[in-house]
Design a protein with these regions (language model features):
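Active-site-proximal alpha-helix that buttresses catalytic centers in soluble enzyme cores
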Residues: 1-139
Length: 139
């Protein structure tokens, strides 16, 4: 499952090893129930096992925040950060709040590049997977 390449071009440096200058932040809403994040942590851990530098960040309730995750990656020497929102659709959080947060990151960390992937539901492969999942659930 990947973002459409037309919107987020593949980055040959992501996962290139310890000398890579690129990292990923998986950005999710957050919840009061701590177990809520377990699937996200599993995705993060699987991506890390592939050699990517990946951090989780949350819009609210949970930590770290997007700013804290970005600050940590930049302190570790990463110059390109791709933010992958784990939201199914483009609502207020992705249309208004995330762009404002990314604008703030760009001002505070002018020497870094911040990219933003589209919502999960913008990817035809994600929609096909959801359709297949629903079909399995009703049979």
């Amino acid at each position: 499952m990947r973002a459409p390449s037309a919107q987020v071009p593949p980055d040959p440096l992501v996962g290139a090893g310890p000398m890579s200058s690129s990292a990923v932040i998986l950005f999710a809403h957050g919840a009061r129930e701590p177990d809520w994040a377990q699937p996200l942590e599993l995705v993060r851990d699987r991506l890390r096992a592939e050699g990517l530098r990946v951090e989780l960040a949350y819009l609210e309730i949970m930590a770290p925040s997007l700013e804290d995750a970005a600050r940590s990656l930049i302190a570790d020497g990463y110059k390109t950060v791709t933010i992958v929102p784990l939201f199914l659709a483009q609502g207020k959080h992705l249309k208004r709040q995330l762009p404002e947060m990314v604008a703030t990151l760009r001002k505070r960390h002018a020497d870094a590049e911040f990219r933003v992937a589209p919502a999960l539901g913008d990817d035809p492969e994600i929609l096909a997977a959801i359709t297949a999942w629903v079909n399995r659930a009703v049979r």
